[in-house]
């Protein structure tokens, strides 16, 4: 469970950072 959660987090973080930089 935590392994999957970690993978999702690693994919989500760059996406969120990208959205913040665009704003």
Curated annotation (Swiss-Prot):
Please name the GO terms of the biological process aspect recorded for this protein, alphabetically: defense response to other organism
Where does the protein principally reside?
secreted
Tissue specificity comment: Expressed by the venom gland.
GO CC terms of this entry: extracellular region; membrane; other organism cell membrane
For this protein, the record's InterPro entries field holds: Antimicrobial_4
For the keyword Lipid metabolism, the answer is no
Q: Tell where it localizes.
A: Secreted; Target cell membrane
Q: Supply the alphabetized keyword list.
A: Antimicrobial, Membrane, Secreted, Target cell membrane, Target membrane
Q: Which family does it belong to?
A: Belongs to the non-disulfide-bridged peptide (NDBP) superfamily. Medium-length antimicrobial peptide (group 3) family. Ponericin-W subfamily.
| Name the UniProt record assigns to this protein | U1-poneritoxin-Da3b
